[in-house]
Amino acid sequence: MTTLLHLQNGTDIRGIALENEHALPITLSKSSTQAIAVGFINWIAEMQTSFHSPMTLSIGTDSRLSGSQLKEWLTEVFVSYGIHVIDVGLATTPAMFMSTVFPSYQSDAAIMITASHLPYFYNGFKFFTKDGGLEKHDITYILNHSDTTSFPKGKSSISKRNLIADYSAHLIQKIREETNCSLPLEGLHIIVDAGNGAGGFFVEQILTPLGADTTGSQFLEPNGLFPNHIPNPENKEAMHSVSYAVTKHHADLGIIFDTDVDRAAIVLSDGKEVNRNRFIALLSAITLEEHPQSVIVTDSVTSSGLAEFIQAHGGIHHRFKRGYRNVINEGIRINRETDKPCYLAIETSGHGAMAENYFLDDGAYLVAKILISLSKWKQSGLTIEQILSSLKEPAEEKEYRIPILHKNFKDYATAILSDLQEYILNHKNYSVAPKNYEGLKILTPTGWFLIRISLHEPLLVLNMESNTEGGIQKDLEILYKFFANYKYLNQNVLK
């Protein structure tokens, strides 16, 4: 049995799809791509879910150069097994999920061809049914059952649909209903930076029909080489790009999406970036206005100031693990198992999901929620700046990714964390955080640091926050002495 497990990246499949200047070998070839299609068919058969007969599957791509070829290879397999394929062309990851929800599509499943913000020569697949995105164990099953299938052969057809137009109409209807206004953005100057990914539609298909002036929007054209900057709301160059555009054109707001539009961030009129903790704070304020005393789930590296902000707005902050699917699934679990509801689960990366939207991480939907509130606040004179004014910002925050050179890196890293916990207790005013869900979180005299094992790489990831200048350096000096005892730990990155 051939295994393709090396292509698994958590709940996604990712690989090299194009020849590249780094001479990295192609791993998403025709044979491996079509084997993945077979694996998905086997997963469908194993699930024994009640799909339509014949089954309908929608497939879309982001702007990557290899997307059309991969789609063609997948389609060839699915059609040969009697599965009707809806080719939706350029799409976003959230829109692909919605194709399983929209009654006019009735897709039993959907595949998004994307590799998020990775370099142009990568690509990959995300899978959905109406129940949501496939989990890690589902992807493992697909890749382990990709050789042959007993699924009956058949003959089917391909149709083409404009999913982005239908998805845009869905968002426009949502915004107009919530604001009770046909042109709720009239008088607002809003710039979009799509980074040449799939998010350029947001200008002409959503903002303009709602009355916004979008002069100065940039990099809207799909270009899989991403020639201007990486489409990534966490990337400094990308955030600087949209920030500069906002101030240059004297806009009221800037919006930036990642490649497949499941993440987003915004920029205020003065160029101030609202991503990471600020983005979470803004959406928490909006959510808690609608759902007081509800739970906000975040990942583990959010700031202490954010926790205070959520509490001050009447919410319960549940700081969980890194990994957007971990965060979203925790929100779902809380709703299933407790009497304290969760309406927002969001990671500092910009992946955020709302209960009202199928707990789907959808950057465009999150921006739509912000636009709805912006329209309402405008009438009462309230601004985003005022909403965020009470968010305490740390004086310093840093992340270090420390390579582990040991072949059994997870065991080695686990031992380091255990030893560190014992070591740190010998230092005055340092203590282990009482409530923590991953790695080791240490409370320091000026803030905290969290050290954890990377989800996918041989790394220790160290996040640090201090409320005073120089606090991180003092914490690092303590860590230098400790790390010096571990020869397979490359602590040069800390210097």
Language-model regions, residue ranges each:
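A short, gly/pro- and small-residue-rich
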Residues: 120-145, 267-283, 357-368
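Proline/glycine-rich low-complexity loops and linkers
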Residues: 79, 88-93, 143-173, 183, ...
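An N-terminal, well-structured beta->alpha segment
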Residues: 1-74, 80-81, 157-187
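Gly/Ser/Thr-enriched, mixed-charge loops and adjacent short helices
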Residues: 121-246
